[in-house]
Amino acid sequence: MVNVTVDPLTRIEGHQRISTEVDANGVITDAQSSSLIFRGFERILQHQDPRDAAFLTQRICGVCPLSHGLTATNALDELYGVAEHVPKDALVMRNIFQGLNMVASHATHIYVLFGPDLANPAYKKVLTPLGDTGSAVWDEMLGRFAPISYKMDGAAIPAGSSYMAAIPEKKRLQEMIALIAGRMPGPSSLYPGGYTYPATVADITKLSTYYLQVMDFVSAHTLKVDFNTWIENTYKASSPTKAVNFVTEHLTDLINKSTSSNDFSKEAGWGDVEFYAAFGSELVGEKLLGLPASLKHDTIGGYQDPSKICFVAYGGYYKPTDGYDPRSPAGDRIFTSGVVSGNLEYLKFDPDKITESTAHSFYQNSVNDLPPVKGETVPFTDPEKIVYTGGSDSQYSWDKAPRYDGIAGEVGPLARMLNIKEPLVTGLALALAENGYSPANVYTRMLARMQETAILAYELLNWVTVDYEPGGKISVPLDFNAAKDSQGMGLWEAPRGALGHWISTNGSGKVANYQCIVPGSWLMSPRDSNGIPGPLEQSLIGSKINPVGEVDYTNPVGIFHMGRSYDPCISCAVHTIDLTGKCAPNTLRIL
């Protein structure tokens, strides 16, 4: 047995360590997911004015500040009793904020955080011996996804075309948010009861111009098939079978045109989505399309025991009407709330079934498995107790272990697409399950993220040009007495998954307790009080460290793929702790 540890896993967004035990066949037999720093925002918010939560919590993460700001605002809407009265145009503008932020985040993940692993030399060793076709596929992967300052065998590799093109698009999307939200990151226009800046006709016109420029990137790099044709035949398909058939027929046409010339370029019709859809999966690429090889990403990152996992979505994006239900019942939002079991059975979502365990975390809470509204954040203060190498029976992470009805929950694009029964992703999940694969794996997670990006690009156009009406009502007044001895819950969908904020106030209307359960905690969580591993840990156990080729303990590309397929954001999950006593408590400095 060989210990293989990846530390850090994350390219940005905090510090995450994965420690695994691997057998002689390269199969992972045990795993621990450790978040290496402590998040103290819940303690910072105590005794603050509740309205500050919408601004302070945005500092939890610079990638998805809007998600935290919107979730906090949702909690404040309920705290002040105005959720049912928030004007339609305010809700539509919140949709635009979040949609732009999610597209920007997904593009960053696909091209900058996950994509570079497709240029890993492990794939060169597997593909180039397959002759001209294999070499052409490898050259295409390297030419699209190689990161900046990349070397292989001592030679400098030019940065990939898709990688480089995505970076200015991220900037453009940030500028779009700043135009209507005040600034990005850390927008200043969120407020309970609505939002603060009435976007003008000129703003909407400029936003539309930006949108067309972003869609130019999509057509040049991401999807080479006509965008509306893709949406009509996948997102709007009448059944999962029809969506999958459309994609496989489209890929078959591309293969028939490309195999004789070995041209898998964008100019030959291979957008990044088409390329990964064909070559990323053993089932799709090799068994359905007859390709000589694939990356076999559908063979790693799955769940061995479906009874120990579920797929949780809180629901996101308001319907264009006045008011909303803060508890997010099924059907209340465009992306509905829900729970899908590991066997793909659909269940009703109940926020009262959410708890957090600290049995394997660095906390000295008085009670385990607390609901978030009663949650505690009492960290270890003895540095001798903070050890990451004690194994699965020890306490080994700063992350808590959220559970839904006692079960570990995967959150994020795959969970959202399954819960809304999106035809393409649902069809792929069903096909994989029918053929003996886990319906959740690296391949389906990444395709779900790509598909969600396309769906949001489609929905954004409608929100910007149809649903939002300049000059409409954007806020309602607050009764500050309503926030005394009160509670609020904000349930929302961040790019990486279900995000919840819970707030309680005292008789003076100040924050008495504040708790966040973030996607990174759901996904990267350690074991719970029953010893059940978190989603990432479960997906590692039973998977190979190298999905293709020989076992290579020094280049465990499978671990990279599995960990990064969840788009881990440890900045949200954890922050920092001072064990020296040099920093005065309750001192907050905003730079």
Swiss-Prot record:
Gene3D superfamilies: Cytochrome-c3 Hydrogenase, chain B. Mg(2+) binds at residues 42, 575. It catalyses: methanophenazine + H2 = dihydromethanophenazine. It is found in: Cell membrane. Its main location: membrane. Its EC number is 1.12.98.3. It is an enzyme of class 1 (oxidoreductase). Induction: Expressed in methanol-grown cells. The keyword Phosphoprotein does not apply. Its cofactor is Ni(2+); Fe cation. GO terms for molecular function: ferredoxin hydrogenase activity; Methanosarcina-phenazine hydrogenase activity; nickel cation binding. It comes from the Archaea. One of its GO terms (cellular component) is plasma membrane. It is a peripheral membrane protein. One of its GO terms (biological process) is methanogenesis. InterPro entries: Ni-dep_hyd_lsu, Ni-dep_hyd_lsu_Ni_BS, NiFe-Hase_large, NiFe/NiFeSe_hydrgnase_LSU. Keywords: Cell membrane, Iron, Magnesium, Membrane, Metal-binding, Methanogenesis, Nickel, Oxidoreductase. Fe cation binds at residues 64, 572. Coiled coil: none annotated. Ni(2+) binds at residues 61, 64, 569, 572. Composed of a large subunit (VhtA), a small subunit (VhtG) and a cytochrome subunit (VhtC). Belongs to the [NiFe]/[NiFeSe] hydrogenase large subunit family. Part of the F420 non-reducing hydrogenase II complex that catalyzes the reduction of methanophenazine to dihydromethanophenazine. This is F420 non-reducing hydrogenase II large subunit. It comes from Methanosarcina mazei (strain ATCC BAA-159 / DSM 3647 / Goe1 / Go1 / JCM 11833 / OCM 88).
